[in-house]
């Protein structure tokens, strides 16, 4: 039987299990399981259904085996910043509150006298986001100090899922770097920051890098799914995995991981933690082989996903993405525009109403139809991509000549064309399953299928269709 590997790729709205194989240097993907991820309201907070996630991860392993696959290894990637605290017995403490919850709204201001953001950025290189792990932990300390007092372990979401599969605890580097508690230079927990914030140092475990074998499936999981395999750490932050799968032609390409979030940037060998970089809110996230993903977080397809969900609730039938794109094309001349980085779009009760209100507040044309709402979102995303690339060129001192888009958003050729037009740069779109591919690439490199990252990236060009949009 052909050797295969399994990527479990979980985003903020859905997860999927994808089998990867490679033959004569050509990779192939086979989706074997898909599930929805959702937020639930609990004790006044927006929380993840963590037990549901664990169950779906395990069910997907079983589905892979039922489909005739026996993976050699499995790797899990998810979104960043969210975490669980565990007690001495390995039992979760409290609820797994999600980054879209509002508990961190005032934390930056409260922490400023203790730890000025200028110092935090200079040490960690991590951009300001209201929901950063550092603010979540401080909000938790304020609301539930007893939970931190009882904690023995801190695990990010993929770390916890790995623990539930193997019984082994580890903090993976790419996700840990997003906490704003890891030194940009040291690549380890920053004791000065942790101590200054009054957080218990003992809960932060040894940091492991992508490619590390964590352990094998526990006996209970193995018996249920019908096989055993090793759990290997990919870049567990989904953006870290997605950036690995960018088949860039040269070092003048901008990377754009397009999903619920749009992460736009480049790979650097060294972090950029200058005051100008801080002012522009660019981040230096840890990557594979200690590369730095120098990028900007942009709201991304979350706004479109929210509009789609809302329309489904109103009518009983969710429109397809092609239908939403077509509605925008019919309103292509509409000039509404908003700032996608505004926190008002993080978790509004109605995205449609919020877009309209933001246009009104900004003195822009207010959309009246679904198509005009969609066109406003497309105008806003393409504008924000263009602005971010201008900032990127200024901060790095380099001129970029193309944009490589990976992830689910790479399928949206209307947005790709608008991005090409706004930036006046050619756009290369694909592969779609960039995150799962990056996850699989780390497993395959570890197994010797590819000699290194350059070899694996060369395989992507041979294995998948990359579409091109030239600026008009």
Feature locations, PLM:
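Carbohydrate-associated surface elements
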Residues: 101
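Active-site core segments that coordinate phosphate-bearing ligands/cofactors
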Residues: 6-7, 19-21, 105, 112-124, ...
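A conserved helix-loop-beta module that forms one wall/lid of the active-site cleft
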Residues: 191, 197-210
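Glycine-rich beta-strand-to-loop/alpha-helix junction loops that act as flexible
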Residues: 77-80, 210-211, 258-261, 402-410
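Short acidic-aromatic active-site loops that bind/stabilize oxyanions
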Residues: 46-54, 126, 130, 207-211, ...
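Short glycine-rich phosphate-binding loop at a beta-alpha junction
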Residues: 70-78, 153, 206, 398-407
């Amino acid at each position: 039987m052909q050797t295969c590997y399994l990527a479990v790729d979980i985003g903020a709205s859905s997860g999927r299990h994808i089998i990867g194989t490679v033959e004569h240097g050509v990779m192939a993907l086979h989706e074997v399981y898909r599930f929805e991820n959702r937020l639930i309201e609990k004790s006044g907070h927006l929380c993840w259904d963590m037990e549901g996630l664990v169950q779906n991860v395990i069910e997907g392993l079983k589905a892979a085996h039922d489909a005739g696959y026996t993976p050699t290894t499995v790797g899990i990637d998810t979104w960043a910043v969210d975490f669980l605290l565990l007690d001495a017995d390995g039992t979760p403490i409290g609820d797994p509150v999600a980054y879209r919850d509002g508990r961190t709204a005032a934390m930056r201001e409260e922490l400023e006298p203790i730890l000025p953001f200028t110092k935090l950025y200079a040490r960690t290189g991590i951009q300001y986001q209201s929901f950063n792990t550092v603010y979540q932990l401080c909000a938790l300390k304020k609301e539930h100090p007893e939970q931190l007092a009882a904690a023995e372990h801190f695990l990010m979401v993929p770390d916890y899922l790995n623990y539930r599969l193997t019984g082994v605890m580890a903090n993976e580097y790419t996700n840990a770097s997003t906490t704003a508690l890891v030194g940009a230079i040291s690549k380890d927990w920053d004791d000065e920051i942790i101590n200054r914030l009054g957080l218990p140092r003992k809960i932060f475990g040894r940091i492991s890098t992508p490619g590390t074998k964590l352990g094998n499936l526990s006996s209970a999981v193995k018996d249920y799914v019908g096989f055993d395999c090793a759990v290997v750490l990919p870049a567990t932050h989904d953006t870290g995995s997605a950036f690995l799968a960018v088949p860039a032609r040269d070092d003048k390409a901008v990377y754009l991981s397009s999903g619920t979030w749009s992460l736009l940037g480049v790979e650097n060998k060294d972090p950029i933690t200058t005051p100008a970089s801080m002012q522009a809110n660019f981040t230096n996230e840890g990557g594979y082989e200690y590369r730095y993903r120098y990028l900007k977080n942009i709201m991304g397809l979350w706004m479109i996903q929210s509009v789609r969900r809302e329309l489904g609730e109103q009518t009983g039938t969710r429109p397809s993405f092609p239908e939403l794109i077509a509605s925008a094309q019919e309103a292509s001349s509409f000039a509404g525009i908003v700032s996608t980085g505004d926190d008002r779009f993080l978790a509004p009760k109605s995205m449609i109403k919020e877009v309209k209100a933001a246009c009104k507040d900004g003195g822009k044309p207010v959309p009246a139809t679904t198509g005009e709402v969609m066109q406003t979102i497309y105008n806003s995303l393409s504008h924000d991509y263009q602005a971010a690339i201008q900032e990127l060129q200024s901060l790095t001192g380099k001129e970029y000549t193309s944009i490589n888009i990976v992830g689910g958003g790479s399928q949206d050729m209307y947005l790709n064309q608008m991005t090409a037009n706004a930036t006046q740069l050619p756009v290369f779109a694909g592969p779609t399953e960039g995150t799962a591919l990056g996850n699989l690439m780390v497993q395959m490199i570890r197994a010797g299928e590819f000699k290194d990252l350059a070899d694996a990236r060369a395989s992507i060009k041979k294995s998948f269709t990359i579409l091109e949009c030239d600026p008009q």
